[in-house]
Swiss-Prot record:
Pfam families reported for this sequence: FAM32A (PF08555)
UniProt-annotated stretches for the region Disordered: 23-56
Any one Gene Ontology BP term: apoptotic process
Listed name of the protein: Protein FAM32A
Cystine residue pairs: none
Family membership: Belongs to the FAM32 family.
Compartments in which it is found: Nucleus
Species in which this protein is naturally found: Rattus norvegicus
Lineage of the species this protein comes from: Eukaryota, Metazoa, Chordata, Craniata, Vertebrata
Gene Ontology annotations for the cellular component aspect, listed alphabetically: nucleolus
Length: 112
């Protein structure tokens, strides 16, 4: 038990470091931050509008092409949304009925 009598009890201390107390951090005032944020949001909206005007360097043909692409995509979406799933399944079954039976597997007979 004599070996355990030499154990240091208490907090560890670092050599060469003066004892410094725990310092509390200063709290930031939120009112000033909120005011700055509101100002920044107002200016950022204005900047975004200006950037949009400056960044639109597409040719008229490119703008027309993208406009037509969006229009066609909307038409496709409306066309798909107009039918219910049940109607689509019925149309698909009608289409399969009209196909030739070329791809059907012929009957396999063991006798012939």
């Amino acid at each position: 038990m004599e070996a355990y009598e030499q154990v240091q009890k208490g907090p560890l201390k670092l050599k060469g470091v003066a004892e410094l107390g725990v310092t509390k951090r200063k709290k930031k005032k939120k009112d000033k931050d909120k005011a700055k944020m509101l100002e920044a949001m107002g200016t950022s909206k204005k900047n975004e509008e200006e950037k949009r005007r400056c960044l639109d360097k597409r040719t008229p043909a490119q703008a027309a092409f993208e406009k037509m692409q969006e229009k066609r995509q909307m038409e496709r979406i409306l066309k798909k949304a107009s039918k219910t799933h049940k109607q689509r399944v019925e149309d698909f079954n009608r289409h399969l009925d009209t196909l030739t039976e070329h791809y059907d597997i012929p009957k396999v007979s063991w006798t012939k």
